[in-house]
């Protein structure tokens, strides 16, 4: 089976596309598919001609488009059936939502990485599946916490919270974590029982291996986002058994299940004036941090990822079943 993956050209990535697109393609190859890529550069409509040329040369059985705008390019060619995956960015802007979801009605099948993305789409595909992106388990190498800290030069006596993004990414909502940590550190009852300092570390400009090592070294992975698709970094933190705290968004509740070492915070809705936390959310975050930082152990998150069939290998098999249903 020949699959042509279509996505937007990204200048700041080694393969010029988002890592999970490349990794999904590699997993499909490992499962027996022949995979090639087409990257949309510039205008989405003007890219249709180049895509048709690529299709005639490669002769794929399926064109698989990632993200709604790339799907516009894919769905305007009429040579090969299209599968479209929505990753969440399509729902954040109403113009993009309208155009992406409208064009997705032309696709043979739509994959939403989480149910809420379909719920938020203006036009909802009838032929669809909920299939999150998978985790490259072979890269999720577990290093003992003490050893990981030695490699990073982290203080063994401090509490480290790994923030799931860059501090300046408003959607990731670092102000909530920052303010909660400061409030916790100022709490005399906490200081009485915890003499160690708390350090927040951002995930910015890091390789996959560098991120994984920090997940192994951290006491807690924090993702207080306002919006996510099916958060990859969170799944990766779980895959190395790092305790996690996240807002109740996307598929977080389903990911955590009833496993210990995972904490869920209600989603503090942003207003036009403020993206940071209201007092209720802040107090809740402080209480959850207090509990999470006292946990000190590791989780069974890796086993949870496997049970939920969220490894790249497992996800590839589910996607191939979608392809087969179209070709047959």
Language model feature labels by segment:
Residues 116, 134:
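Carbohydrate-associated surface elements
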Residues 122, 135-151:
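Acidic anion/phosphate-binding donor-loop and adjacent secondary structure
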Residues 65-70, 86:
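Short His-centered aromatic/hydrophobic patch
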Residues 19, 273-287, 293-324:
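A charged, aromatic-enriched C-terminal amphipathic alpha-helix characteristic of glycosyltransferases
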Residues 104, 213-218:
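Short alpha-helical donor nucleotide-sugar binding micro-motif in glycosyltransferases
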